[in-house]
């Protein structure tokens, strides 16, 4: 009994993908340049607290509140222009609020606190304050002190205190105390509760990232993507031929930029999760491209003598059904996350969906045509070199 299989794309399909390669490449270059302009010049990426530094709060309201109202209220607190965006769906009444400050305590205020406590408590031997860490003061005393007294002295200097922690120390050693002062999150939460009611606003989560740490994370994110592409370049070069590698890398750069464009257009936060999305898209895209390259290699051996252009087009058509089914199945699972997910999960799924579509497109219209161009370019170069007149000494040697 003959088995019949479902075929999404009928065998023998001969759609000419290579015919439109110039239009596709020109269109891709234009879109990529627009995305890069948008990411770096205007309107620029909406960096999350991971990269921009500052304080980010997730705030839940038990009644309907507009983002503009929250923004206006936070703006009154003197943190500069805050970023306020809805988190999840509208019914959840949750917002992400980001300000550039990570601490209310400045170096000047810390010096003032140190001077006041030094005067009131001569047993103090030192105080440490790091603006990158945030609202924390570390004190050292020759002998144990009353924590309540330390709290009142710090507050008397104009710095509200959340907590005083005594660190354990051995007898005869200096005693250390850590004073945790109120930060931007406390001030914002207090202002919103004063505006909407004591139980109306709840700070669900607060994240702090210093500006130097944010820059380092941004650099590390870029390096992670570059390292991944470099390893893929080496892998493709060894598995196939180094003529295939440039096409893969250009396609991956294209996919990474298109995924970046999702964050530029939607104004969703670009953070460490976004870098994870780009790395995932790069991995998914190269898998799709390698499947087509495998078929190109097989067909090149099977159809020796045929132009590479025809072999590439044949290979894409033969793998068309597999590509559509694989990408479609992944896209369906992402649609479920988009519909049911919220916040970061939803952003991840949306960006992945864009990346998968871009990866499928780049396999057909970027990576494969680039391989053809490199082959044609090398053939032209060989023909030009062969047509050049040989030096007389080489002609004489050939005559012998």
Regions found by a protein language model. Give the residues of each.
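A structural signal for conserved, well-ordered secondary-structure elements
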Residues: 1-400
């Amino acid at each position: 009994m003959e088995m019949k299989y479902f075929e999404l794309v009928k065998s023998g399909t001969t759609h000419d993908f290579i015919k439109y390669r110039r239009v596709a490449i020109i269109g891709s270059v234009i879109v990529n340049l627009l995305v890069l302009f948008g990411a770096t010049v205007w309107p620029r990426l909406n960096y999350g607290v991971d990269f921009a530094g500052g304080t980010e709060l997730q705030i839940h309201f038990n009644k309907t509140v507009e983002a503009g109202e929250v923004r206006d209220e936070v703006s009154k607190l003197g943190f500069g222009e805050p970023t306020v965006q809805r988190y999840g769906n509208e019914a959840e009444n949750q917002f992400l609020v980001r300000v550039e400050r990570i601490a209310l305590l400045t170096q000047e205020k810390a010096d003032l606190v140190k001077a006041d406590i030094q005067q009131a408590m001569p047993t103090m031997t030192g105080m440490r304050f790091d603006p990158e860490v945030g609202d924390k003061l570390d004190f050292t005393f020759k002998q144990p002190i009353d924590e309540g007294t330390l709290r009142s002295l710090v507050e008397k200097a104009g710095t509200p205190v959340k907590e005083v922690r005594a660190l354990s120390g051995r007898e005869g050693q200096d005693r250390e105390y850590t004073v945790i002062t109120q930060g931007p999150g406390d001030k914002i939460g207090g202002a919103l509760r004063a505006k909407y009611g004591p139980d109306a606003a709840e700070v669900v989560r607060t994240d702090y990232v210093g500006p130097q740490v944010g820059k380092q994370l941004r650099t590390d994110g870029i390096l992670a993507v570059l390292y991944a592409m470099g390893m893929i370049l080496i892998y493709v070069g060894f598995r196939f031929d180094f003529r295939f590698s440039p096409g893969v890398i250009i396609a991956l750069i294209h996919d990474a930029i298109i995924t970046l464009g999702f964050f530029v257009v939607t104004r969703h936060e670009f953070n460490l999760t976004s870098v994870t999305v780009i790395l995932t898209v790069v991995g998914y895209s190269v898998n799709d491209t390698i499947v087509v390259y495998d078929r190109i290699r097989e067909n090149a051996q099977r159809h020796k003598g045929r132009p590479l252009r025809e072999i590439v087009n044949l290979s894409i058509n033969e793998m068309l059904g597999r590509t559509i089914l694989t990408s479609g199945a992944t896209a369906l699972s992402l649609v479920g996350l988009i519909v049911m997910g919220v916040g970061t999960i939803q952003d991840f799924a949306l960006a992945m969906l864009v990346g998968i579509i871009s990866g499928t497109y780049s396999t057909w219209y970027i990576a494969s045509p680039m391989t053809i161009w490199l082959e044609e370019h090398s053939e032209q170069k060989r023909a030009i070199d062969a047509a050049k007149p040989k030096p007389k000494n080489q002609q004489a040697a050939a005559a012998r």
